[in-house]
Regions:
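Bacterial N-terminal signal peptides that target proteins for export
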Residues: 2-15
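Bacterial N-terminal signal peptides
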Residues: 12-24
Length: 217
């Protein structure tokens, strides 16, 4: 059955349709197609991460949004040759927005194992992963007292071998769980929170109408 449409109804439908298109465009524009950021060395262990007397280790990250998954590429330089690491996305950073240690930091929260890394003989490495990252990466455990989804918008990597950080004061009898054997060394480098939203750099579309800020998926 067809219904007659008056000129007024046609005008209303046109306005609603135009608004829907505009709203949709704004949502798409709010989500960046890619983002880039640098990781910051853990000051306690930077001398074991790089070559003594050499330039400061660096790590740059680029994430490109995809239709079904995102592509993250990490490139590092000035690393001590042949060192191995384990990369994770985590809920919290140990740093403040200015890159200094956060005195209120207690733990990294939820962590997702993403990739192994290893420097070559020149102290460089590059690795690429494809997974859900920008604005949506999360995990949850319904058995926990807080079963809600938890985002992991920070990125960091840990020394794979605790002995590689022993000369800088790491207690090798107390390894961290950040490798496949759960016998890793300390944090080597990690991302910083945004100074305004306090969210990690994998959130490109923050919602500042909430307190604390959240991320629009």
């Amino acid at each position: 059955m067809k219904f007659a449409t008056s000129p007024l109804n046609k005008a209303i439908h046109a306005v609603v349709f135009a608004f829907a298109l505009t709203s949709g465009s704004q949502t798409l524009l709010a989500q960046a197609s890619q983002t880039e950021f640098d990781l910051v060395p853990n000051a306690k262990f930077v001398d074991c991460l790089g070559v003594p007397g050499g330039p400061t280790p660096t790590a740059h990250v680029k994430v490109v949004r995809g239709r079904f998954s995102d592509t993250l590429t990490i490139t590092a330089d000035n690393i001590r040759p042949r060192l191995a690491f384990d990369m994770f996305t985590v809920q919290r950073s140990s740093l403040r927005a200015n890159g200094t240690p956060d005195p209120a930091f207690k733990n990294f929260g939820l962590a997702w194992y993403q990739s192994d890394l290893q420097a070559n003989s020149s102290g460089k490495f590059t690795a690429t992963i494809k997974t859900i990252l920008l604005d949506q990466i999360f995990g949850f455990d319904p058995d926990l007292s807080n079963p809600n989804p938890i985002n992991t918008f920070h990125l960091g990597f840990w020394f794979n071998d605790p002995n590689d950080a022993a000369a800088c004061g790491f207690d090798v009898t107390k390894p961290t769980p950040f490798n496949g054997e759960h016998e890793a060394g300390p944090l080597a480098m990690i991302s910083k929170p945004n100074p305004t939203t306090k969210l990690g750099p994998l959130c490109t579309n923050p919602d500042t109408s909430t307190s604390p800020a959240t991320c629009n998926p």
